[in-house]
């Protein structure tokens, strides 16, 4: 099951890359995706299915923020091995209800304390500092507006894998 999830994420990332290349060619330019956030570990474990139902996302448009340094979400049982990426992890249910995970650090600002936030009115994510907006429910963290979308090396949100195990556990991990 874990291999299937990893394979799906690989196929999704390849599809995003293909769309980006095609869109760049169609626009007459050579834009490339830039993910130059510093490396940071991600290890968020939901050991049982009821933990996932409580703390994860189980339906379209649900979202939750995991920031270890701020102990968010409040009451979540982080372990000694837990890590939440460079700026935290935004966990969302995409338009089909499938979970997706993104680093919360704005890829334009590249600082761990300048984070994106989920906009419930527009069902996307945005950076209040630079004004960039990102599609997180149907376009894999691609920028849709603001400096992230306007650069020649446009900035996408860093994605993380969500793996399932044989005993009903879920893990958010860095590929």
Model feature map: region roles:
Residues 24, 100, 121-124:
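Processing junctions and N-termini across compartments
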Residues 1-30:
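Sec-dependent bacterial lipoprotein signal peptides
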Residues 153-156:
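Conserved SAM/SAH cofactor-binding pocket of Class I
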Residues 147-151:
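Short proline/glycine-enriched turn/loop segments at secondary-structure junctions
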Residues 143-145:
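Strand-loop microenvironment adjacent to phosphate/nucleotide-handling motifs in alpha/beta enzyme folds
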Residues 32-119, 135-140, 158-175:
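N-terminal pre-ligand scaffold of iron-sulfur
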Residues 122-132:
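Cysteine-rich micro-motifs
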């Amino acid at each position: 099951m874990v291999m299937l999830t990893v394979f799906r994420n690989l196929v999704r990332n390849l599809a995003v890359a293909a769309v980006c290349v095609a869109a760049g060619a169609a626009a007459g330019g050579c834009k490339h995706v830039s993910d130059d956030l510093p490396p940071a570990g991600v290890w968020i474990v939901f050991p049982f299915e009821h933990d996932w139902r409580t703390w994860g996302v189980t339906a379209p448009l649900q979202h939750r923020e995991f920031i270890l340094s701020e102990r968010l979400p409040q009451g979540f049982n982080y372990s000694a091995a837990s890590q939440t990426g460079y700026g935290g992890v935004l966990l969302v249910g995409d338009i089909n209800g499938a979970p997706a995970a993104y680093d919360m650090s704005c890829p334009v600002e590249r600082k761990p304390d300048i984070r994106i936030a989920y906009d419930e009115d527009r069902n996307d994510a945005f950076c209040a500092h630079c004004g960039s907006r990102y599609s997180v429910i149907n376009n894999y963290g691609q920028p849709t507006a603001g400096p992230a979308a306007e650069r020649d090396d446009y900035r996408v949100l860093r994605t993380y894998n969500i793996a399932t195990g044989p005993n009903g556990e879920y893990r958010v991990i860095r590929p």
